[in-house]
Amino acid sequence: MIEAVSCGGVVIHRGKILLLYKNYKHKYVGWVLPKGTVEPGEMYRQTALREVYEETSVAAKVIRYIGHSQYTFQGKDDIVNKTVHWYLMRANSFYCKPQKEEYFVDAGFYKFHEAYHLLKFNDERQIMKKAYYAYMELEKKKQWIRPKSYRKNVYK
């Protein structure tokens, strides 16, 4: 069994959640959250920011760690046990552009109930739900307001 680690983000802008649509040779089709593999020497937080930017062109800011999900799948040569670390992130615009090289054909920001039903995987639904509730708590406390120093501490 191969152990693999990825990191990703639940990116929110004005209450809407960023999703990607992946279509890989008609074998894998569905809406997902942005995530990707940790590179050597990279911190999880950095990986999450980099992957969000690479897959969507969104320069996001990490707000907090949300948790992790785990799943297994059949890889090319062996079973892969993957752990994904997730972060709640904030974007400062709705602009996004899917990374075609990774077979993402669409990207967009969706209301919570739309995103919940669009997501292909239940573990991503649960992480998104947890992140959205954290966002709502911050919004209620007026702590989600974009600071003037937004451009600091974002990827890119």
Predicted region positions:
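N-terminal strand-loop-strand
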Residues: 1-33
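A periodicity- and composition-biased signal for non-globular, repetitive helical segments
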Residues: 28, 41, 88, 130-131, ...
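Unchanged
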Residues: 38-126, 155
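Functional cleft and adjacent loop/helix regions within the main domain
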Residues: 34, 40, 148-151
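Charged phosphate-binding loop/patch that engages nucleotide di/tri-phosphates or the phosphate backbone
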Residues: 117, 122-156
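A generic structural signal for ordered secondary structure
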Residues: 8, 16-18, 45, 65, ...
